[in-house]
Amino acid sequence: MAEFIRSDILGTTFETTSRYANLQPVGLGTAGVVCSAYDLISEQVVAIKKMMKPFHSTSVAKRTYREVKLLRHLRHDNLINMSDIFISPLEDVYLVTELLGTDLHRLLNGKPLESKFAQYFTYQILRGLKYIHSAGVIHRDLKPGNLLINENCDLKICDFGLARVQEPQMTGYVSTRYYRAPEIMLTWQRYGSKVDLWSVGCILAEMLLGRPLFPGTDHINQFWLITDLLGNPPDEVIDRITTNNTRRVVKSMAKRNPRPLKEILPAAEDAALNLLDNLLVFDPDRRISAEQGLMHPWMAPYHDPTDEPVATEQFDWSFNDADLPLDTWKIMIYSEVLDFFQLTTNAEPSGEQSQNQSQSQSQAFTSSQDLQLASMLNLGEGELLPDFAATIDPNKFGSVDYLMDGQSLDPNSFS
């Protein structure tokens, strides 16, 4: 049976397998706490996210199942990848992912990025979205804090807690207001993957501007800021508003003309502004897709259609509308852990230590009469929201160490 070690991280108890050493607090993520740790098998520093009270209610258990399933099945260079997953004796779910140095929110820190960095980051976001959308998944909560970046400028999308299926009719949701597409604010019953492309436009503008483009104080002020830049929404957009009161208010708004983006981004390249013009479009039917964005002239230095893969199959959303009891969701989560364990143990072993670890976990499983011992597995990957003191100097990309409390994380220093 695998050994679990208890640690206190940000006031909460972490129960991790002996595979992980030197746990250090990173911060609070969505519905969980994140720490860094040294993986004794891979000899890499990783991120471990504890999902708080995953079996507290049916809604929380369903969200936990959705995130675990998504992270298990979505594999792409520009998405955070899960390396391990386990369920502790206290029945908390732990997701283990790669650890990147910072996120875009911290990197910006109130300052614009050089155009070349904004360009490369935008390319990677679009490349990741092309894959996600091809799998029939919408992220729904893209924002700078959900875009992780390392010292080589590699970008990975994380936090799939709000991800949903692309379906003809969808309800509203709570996302970060600054990056929320207008069709969400206008209470459309129908929206699709283009909500993510609106978010990309807001993020690109923020990288060039150094501050949020639409920093609304509430949803009304948010919409006002959007119309102040883009003008009034066209009639075909207004006609699709399903709430009579909202439609009446939007129709009664004073006439506003669109302002040129050059007015607020005078130093931006024309090609970058043109891409923004195609992303920040009221009508999602006229907003470009991720694939079209990759083919935009501003993406030409990086665009390679042979290296922008799509998913090999659609993600299975058959569970999404299921109204199941808590115990059933719990069993389904354990099943995902088991499947992950079987795949990893059938994969090529990485040395004697890894093989011994797999054998130990297998013995823990087969000797158990309770699914609880699925916790002996290593489950992995969830969203990562790094809130630690990592810094990257945009002028010195490629030579930056991960920082924690001002100290470089040197794997050789772990014992």
UniProtKB/Swiss-Prot annotation:
GO terms for molecular function: ATP binding; MAP kinase activity; protein serine kinase activity; protein serine/threonine kinase activity. It catalyses: L-seryl-[protein] + ATP = O-phospho-L-seryl-[protein] + ADP + H(+); L-threonyl-[protein] + ATP = O-phospho-L-threonyl-[protein] + ADP + H(+). It comes from Emericella nidulans (strain FGSC A4 / ATCC 38163 / CBS 112.46 / NRRL 194 / M139) (Aspergillus nidulans). Residues 20-299 form the Protein kinase domain. It is an enzyme of class 2 (transferase). Keywords: ATP-binding, Kinase, Nucleotide-binding, Phosphoprotein, Serine/threonine-protein kinase, Transferase. GO terms for biological process: cellular hyperosmotic response; cellular response to oxidative stress; osmosensory signaling pathway; p38MAPK cascade; stress-activated MAPK cascade. Its cofactor is Mg(2+). This is Mitogen-activated protein kinase mpkC. Dually phosphorylated on Thr-171 and Tyr-173, which activates the enzyme. The modification Phosphothreonine is found at T171. ATP binds at V26, G27, L28, G29, T30, A31, G32, V33, V34, K49. Mitogen-activated protein kinase required for growth on media where sorbitol or mannitol is the sole carbon source. The keyword Nucleotide-binding applies. The gene is mpkC. A motif (TXY) lies at residues 171-173.
